[in-house]
A protein has these predicted regions:
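Short, well-formed alpha-helical segments that are part of the catalytic scaffolds
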Residues: 14-29
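Acidic helix N-cap motif at the loop->helix transition within catalytic regions
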Residues: 16-20, 47-56
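Conserved sequence signature across two-component system core domains
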Residues: 11, 41-43, 68
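Conserved donor nucleotide-binding strand/loop of the catalytic core
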Residues: 36-39, 50-84
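A conserved acidic beta->alpha catalytic loop
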Residues: 42-51, 97
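Hydrophobic helical membrane-anchoring modules
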Residues: 1-5, 145-147, 170-262
């Protein structure tokens, strides 16, 4: 089984934390992976993030930088990385250093040993009660939609690129709900591992904004309609490994309708 991994690191105004995040990603990847790349997606930052990203690309040959001219959101950053990925597996690691480096070790160690990795946060009390309640609700809804007993629906993942590219493009914050639920319904085998959160103020997390919460619920509701009410079947077309390299530099652009969804 192939083991190459593309790591997407979205960053919006993360000049203080991006270097630490990328440094830990590269260190963990070197410990566990034979081949990997890191794609930093500067999502329209207005602070010193672009300069930090350029320095990281100069320091680490495995790091490349893609810039969105305006802030499009984490879902758009995910799809930018997915479109450009050169390897058969992909993980998104937030540029705000939300996860402890030990979690990266646990995740990267499983790349190529199972088709998909789903993590669960072992120290959820590092977040506020409201954030924990949101996570519990999201996880229970994901179990209902997919019929799979996962422990956490909102953490780190490793997705198989060939299958993830066949999932409906969701450029909003609910990209992970769309992708994870579709892959689980499609029968992609997975393993679960615990990860640790780094303490931080929840006020810095965009997931707690009302507009974001509404879009998350809308995405989950649409998946419930598809898979529970309409009993839609998921079938993935076989994709040759060579396809990954042929599409690795295709430009990413959002249509007006996609911007409205995001």
């Amino acid at each position: 089984m192939a083991t190459g991994l593309t790591v997407v690191v979205p960053a919006w105004n993360e000049e203080r934390r991006l270097a630490v995040t990328v440094g830990e990603v590269v260190a963990a990847a070197r410990r566990h992976l034979g081949e990997f790349e890191v794609i930093v997606v500067d999502d329209g930052s207005t602070d010193g993030t672009p300069a930090v990203a350029r320095k990281l690309a100069a320091k680490f040959p495995c790091v490349s930088v893609v810039r969105h001219e305006t802030n499009l959101g984490v879902g758009a950053a995910f799809h930018t990385g997915l479109t450009r990925a050169r390897f058969p597996y992909l993980s998104l690691v937030p540029g705000d250093n939300a996860f402890h480096e030990s979690g990266l070790d646990a995740v990267f160690a499983l790349v190529g040993k199972v088709e998909m990795v789903v993590t669960y946060r072992a120290n959820p009390r590092a977040r506020t009660p409201m954030r924990r309640l949101l996570s519990v609700c999201c996880t229970r809804a994901m179990r209902l939609v997919t019929g799979r007993p996962i422990r956490d629906a909102h953490s780190l993942y490793v997705f198989p690129v060939a299958q993830a590219r066949q999932v409906r493009r969701n450029t909003g914050y609910g990209y992970h709900i769309e992708t994870l639920s579709t892959l689980l319904r499609g029968g992609v085998p997975f393993a679960e591992v615990p990860v640790q959160l780094n303490p931080r103020p929840d006020s810095s997390s965009k997931v707690m904004r009302l507009g974001v919460l509404a879009r998350l619920m809308a995405t989950m509701g649409r998946q419930f309609l598809r898979f529970v009410v309409l009993r839609e079947k998921v079938r993935f077309a076989p994709v040759a490994a060579a396809t990954l390299t042929r599409t690795r530099r295709r430009p990413f652009a959002l249509t007006r309708s996609q911007r409205e969804v995001a």
